[in-house]
Amino acid sequence: MNRKDILHVDIEKIKSIEAHLKEVCEDFLNIFPDEIKEKLKDKFYLAGGCIYSLYNDKTPHDYDFFIQDNTTKVNLLTFLLSCTTKFKHGNIAIGKLNGFNFVKTKYAITIIESDHIVNKYQIIHKYIGSPNEVVEEFDFKHNMFYYSPKDNFLGSHESVSFKYLKTNELCFNDLRCRDLCGVILRLPKFTSRGMIIKKKEIAKILIKLQGCINDENEKEIVLDYLSTQGY
């Protein structure tokens, strides 16, 4: 479990975030009946941009949870399907669970409080594995952090410094080689929140794009899009 350069950040703030995320995870588990809670409790963790948001005194839009193994994933999906009230378009299922509404899609489960329209929790079941394995595929380094409720531990990918929690610069994770078009399309989302991206980071994405995408038309579309965005 990595805490590279943790002395460069506010340790008390990290402890405060751990305490907050412990409560978030407990609330999340309490949505489920005891049988499912028992199967989940040591097999899930939280990861992604919510940790960066909390460190920078912002309220996360939602909390993304991940599962460590396929057996736990199957148990969870089987249970949720038993709570389903409506199916739509094959992979989409809608249901209710302990005062919450949920929507299951091919890749994720979104859980929403019944009297709200904003997402509260997301379970990303497309990607399964340990925290280090999963966050290795995240797009930018400020997102490559996780919280393990089992250990009450906030850590980062083994290659990522805790200094990335403090910066407003987007730093591309060049370990990633999937959905690179999606990475580019998400750039305006980050820049609209006050983050910046330097030309060298755009260059890293384009170099990776060159190696991972074989369709020349797709590459051209991406380059045209970057041009229209002023990159």
Mark where each language-model region is.
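Catalytic cores of the polymerase beta-like nucleotidyltransferase superfamily
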Residues: 1-231
